[in-house]
């Protein structure tokens, strides 16, 4: 059974609690952890568009939040960016 949801993932905590040189990698990790918690799955596949959005303005100026469309097929969760 396929399950589809749209989430707005806040990244403000990552910005406030991380040094400027580690913000983008920690933001990607935070997105994965958010999806693990809310979709209840360990296998998370992030689309390249999410990575490009986070890294778009360099590694220290990440967006405050990201809107993501998530599809769960069995145990696999696939996430893409909502435009």
Swiss-Prot record:
It comes from the Archaea. One of its GO terms (cellular component) is cytosolic large ribosomal subunit. GO terms for biological process: cytoplasmic translation. Pfam families: Ribosomal_L31e (PF01198). Keywords: Ribonucleoprotein, Ribosomal protein. Signal peptide: none annotated. InterPro entries: Ribosomal_eL31 (IPR000054), Ribosomal_eL31_CS (IPR020052), Ribosomal_eL31_dom_sf (IPR023621). GO terms for molecular function: structural constituent of ribosome. Transmembrane segments: none annotated. SUPFAM superfamilies: Ribosomal protein L31e. NCBIfam families: PRK01192.1-1. Belongs to the eukaryotic ribosomal protein eL31 family. This is Large ribosomal subunit protein eL31. It comes from Methanococcus maripaludis (strain C7 / ATCC BAA-1331). The gene is rpl31e.
């Amino acid at each position: 059974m396929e399950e589809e949801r749209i989430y707005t993932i806040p990244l403000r905590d990552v910005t406030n609690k991380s040094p400027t040189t580690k913000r983008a990698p920690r933001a990607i990790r935070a997105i994965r952890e958010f999806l693990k918690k809310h979709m209840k799955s360990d296998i998370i596949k992030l689309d390249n568009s999410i990575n490009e959005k986070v890294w778009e303005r360099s590694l220290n100026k990440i967006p405050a939040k990201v809107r993501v469309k998530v599809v769960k097929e069995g145990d696999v969760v696939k996430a893409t960016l909502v435009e």
